[in-house]
Amino acid sequence: MIENQSDNIDNKEKDVSNQDNAPEDISSEQNSTNENDELTSQKKEAINTEELKNTISNNDARLKQLEKEHETLKNQYVRISADFDNFRKRQSRDQDDLKIQIVSKTLTAILPIVDNFERARQQLQPESEEAQALHRSYQGLYKQLVEVLKQQGVSPMRVVGQQFDPNLHEAVLREPSEESDEDFIIEELQRGYHLEGKVLRHALVKVSMGPGKQNSQQEVEKDTVEEDVNSEVNTSEDV
């Protein structure tokens, strides 16, 4: 009986001892769990930081690539825009040139008619009233032709007294002149015309050789004659 009671007391003491040690075990387990959680959290943070750095680096690289592509496309747009603008200007210029070529052919065919009217006006001297009336009628037609030419952008050249220019004039005759310097136009033989600032027809002109040219030519001929005479005289003496 006494032994049983002693055993019960020992068991109770063990239970009390176990109960006293239990909180320490629980606290140790909690600390271990907290440490593991902290390590896990640190690992996750490290992983997230690395991923963020990689993401930022990739985004920077992508941004640079997009900026490069944007610059390339911008340059292409500028070139295409410039090419199109040049094409538009060239197309407009070609159309204007074609228009002038077509108009030039038509107007060039009309110019001889205008020349005939001008010759008639200079040469005809109507005496009777009937002839004068006919002359006025012709002059009316001539003025209408000139007006049509003006409306089409045709303008006559003024060449007398101007220096000879092969781009504008065609020299038909050259002769000495005491009044004009060399290579200056002294007479218009056929009128020249401009069309929109371009030459529609060259003017046929007489050009001055300058003063003294005729005398120089005569002196050359005189010297040649004298040489021939002297040569004949020398030949006679030798005989």
Swiss-Prot record:
Keywords: Chaperone, Cytoplasm, Stress response. One of its GO terms (molecular function) is adenyl-nucleotide exchange factor activity. One of its GO terms (cellular component) is cytoplasm. Pfam families: GrpE. InterPro entries: GrpE, GrpE_coiled_coil, GrpE_head. It comes from the Bacteria. Belongs to the GrpE family. This is Protein GrpE. It comes from Prochlorococcus marinus (strain MIT 9215).
